[in-house]
Amino acid sequence: TIDIDALRKLAHEIKPAMITVGGSLNLFHHPIADVRAIADEVGAKVLFDAAHLCGMIAGKVWPQPLVEGAHLMTFSTYKSLGGPAGGLIVTNDDAIAQKLDAIAYPGLTANFDAAKTAALGVTLQDWKAVGPAYAQMMVKTSQALAQNLQNRGVNIYAADKGFTTSHQFAILAAPYGGGQTAARRMAEAGLLACGIGLPIAAVEGDLNGLRIGTPEIVRLGMKVEHMDQLADFIARSLDATVDSLSVKSEVTQWRKQFSGVHYTVDLPN
């Protein structure tokens, strides 16, 4: 979360032109209105980095930062949005939009990728039709997977707050030698995750958290009822006494039932 009092003090000290809100792990809603109030006090703009939350916002399971007071929002068009690699800058401020338009092309960019633009158009068509259902399932599976892991003795960050309200959560990685070490063990078992820093005691030589997200597994068709089995695989992959390759063979076989791409719409020929 954000320490609003500390932010106000710092903002008045350095008088920034812009205050950026966002991060690589977003578990709970950000106090955008409070940040905007501070920005107004010092004449700053507010930029919300929605790189990881783009799908949550598009699916209306996360507050819309531009409505809450952000002047600008940047986001990836892949990650939780599930589109082609790239990003967008959006605003509901006409003056800012005109300035962005004046410098973006030609200027900061010399051309655009027509194929990527077409792919993004298809992605956004999907979101208009089934985006809310996709986003809701990402959150539900994230919460269910976190709970199932906690039940198996794999401690989750922010357990006292319900783990998460997004598609992401974090495992406390110290018992596994750190987040990157844990991620490598999971990779040996055919499971992908990554280390991440958490605002808790450090792990020397490694990260103290292990980040897990659900956009890909939901797109493949996994639902809440599949999270118990997935938690079992993850818990065993993190157990140093368990053979990772034996877990991988089970994961590979289990994964075969999820072969389609879900939350899409058929476009006319």
Which functions belong to the PLM regions below?
Residues 1-155, 214:
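Conserved PLP-enzyme active-site core in the AAT-like
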Residues 8, 38, 144, 148-152, ...:
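Generic non-transmembrane alpha-helical segments
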Residues 16, 97-102, 119-126, 160-168, ...:
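Short acidic (Asp/Glu) and glycine-rich catalytic loops that position anionic groups and cofactors
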Residues 70, 84-86, 164-168, 183, ...:
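Active-site lining segments that contact anionic ligands and/or coordinate catalytic metals
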Residues 103-106, 190-197:
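Conserved alpha/beta core surface patches that mediate binding of polyanionic ligands
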Residues 124, 135, 139-183, 194-208, ...:
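Conserved small-domain helix->loop->beta segment predominantly found in fold-type I
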Residues 140, 204-269:
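PLP-dependent enzyme catalytic core of the Aspartate aminotransferase-like
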